[in-house]
Amino acid sequence: MVKKNSTKTKVQPYEIGELDHYLFGQGNHYEIYKKMGAHEVTKNGKRGVYFAVWAPHAVNVSVIGEFNDWDETKDKMKRGEPLGIYTCFVPEAKKGDLYKFCIETQAGEKIYKADPFANYAELRPGTASRITDISNLNWSDSKWMTAREKWDNKEEPVSIYEVHMGSWMRHPGREDEGFYTYREFAEAITKYIKEMGYTHVELMGIAEHPFDGSWGYQVTGYYAPTSRYGTPEDFAYMVNYLHKNNIGVILDWVPAHFPKDAHGLADFDGTPTFEYPDPRKGEHPDWGTKVFNYEKPEVSNFLLANALFWVEHYHVDGLRVDAVASMLYLDYGREDGQWIPNKFGGNENLEAIAFFKHLNSVVCGRNKGVMMIAEESTAWPKVTGSPEDDGLGFTLKWNMGWMHDFTEYMKLDPYFRKNAHHMMTFSMEYAYSENYILVLSHDEVVHLKCSMLNKMPGEGWDKFRNLKVAYAFMMGHPGKKLLFMGQEFAQLREWSEERELDWFLLAEEPHQQIQNWYKDLLHLYKKNKALYELDNDPKGFDWINKDDIFRSIFSFTRHSNDGKKNLLFVCNFTPVDRPDYRVGVPRRKQFKLVLNSDETKYGGSGEERPLVYKPEKQECDGQKYSFAYPLPGYGVAVFEY
């Protein structure tokens, strides 16, 4: 038998080969971003850039840019089968050059698209991609990354500061918008977070997006940190700097939908490429955006690899997945006749469910200690359950039910709170059904919802006193914590992405005092295992009195695994002083007052009171022992025992 000579060309490591096509076509090419997009390489001794783009229904594709005077006839790309991945090597292209793909559609049109896998983008309003090299970023956070692998998020303190970079703080008088760069922000936010006591920062709007008013939720560059604040190297510097100061970094991540901007993903090759073809699935009616087609392996792979990209390449510690409910339900935001049932006749998006299970299994399986956080607003079961047990596999879920009941209760005149007492206790009926984060996010301080301070009833100082007791109740309630920027010092105005926070308010005593209060709550939280170790275990929480309806007072205890340094919270939600409020306790041991809202540094009266309380053998609240405490109106007392 005569063997035929092989004519197969050897594939270089940077080139798209058969295995890449196979894995991408199966939806399992977890590092596809290392092949797709634009990468500086050396070919036959020449330095240049290798381009690769997926455009399955394109007739022809060429790459255009500053390196070829945007001439679509110069650098034609070769189609690779079976998936329709177009590639070419351009020796004239170099780091820093702008580029796009010119795609000839089956309709005979030419459309100009940014690179879906670009690692850097032109500053808006420009829409081109920019060649860069992120293969050798400077990292010195190995201590943090090693410790992260041993993290059990359920049993660790997680207090998140939700931040929109462009409006947290700005430089006055700059010719541009005054944005802090990634490097400037790293130093400023680190100093503030360490002083306040947060454990993590969650950043909105990091992935490239053209419209500031979308807050970063209409993404066109999924693999590119926005150029508003600097380069990819600058972004990596920021993450590294935060890690070296023991601060975790969480990013908002948007796999639910994408905008219709002409340079973006919509109708990428002249046909619905990344989105569902039928508008009853592919169009989001509320947001005017396109919905990703999770049924296509290449699309789910694009998103899954993107999650891994941020976590593995940029060392990000968690992703807050936006609008999960809109992905799970086919009829989300749609009227009858506007949606297509699944094959079983139901309203569940089976492909999105499979995507989440795959996503969370892979991200968390490859990266121990990383958090996948679901913003999910319905009662979908097992969001944080294991995929092996038919759960979605998220680490944590935003507790939207708690947030709604809590804010509605706090808006009420104290006289009427007794009629809504259950709104503050109901959350404990389901507190252990998921692994929850208690959130007071950006969504609660926009669109005429008012700032947290202005949600509070009353006038002047009463609003601040209400906010103090609200924050204390939140910090004591089981669940991780998240607060949006500005609310920690009682911002008056609603948030706007167009301006920085009203830091000038800190010149006024009431705003300093509420900031002091939240800071001390954060430090209390971080140093007491009782407040986080058993968040997901009923053994970590007990009501002392949840039925003091007519006085609107709540008392409860928090416990740690070892049973040491337990905490007792007593919270008064009316302005009525209770000079001898008797609280039942489970043990006859000393109770040490560790936090008292009536101190002058928090805006209280400064009235002296004992620091240690010895219970008497007097039944109260169903307990054998009790002690009396002078509880002021809107007062909070936290005791250690």
What are these language model-derived features?
Residues 125, 315-317, 335-498, 505, ...:
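Conserved alpha/beta catalytic core and glycan-binding cleft of carbohydrate-active enzymes
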Residues 145-155, 164-348:
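Substrate-binding/active-site clefts of carbohydrate-active enzymes
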Residues 78, 211-216, 260-267, 384, ...:
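Short glycine-biased active-site loop of nucleotidyltransferases that positions the nucleotide triphosphate
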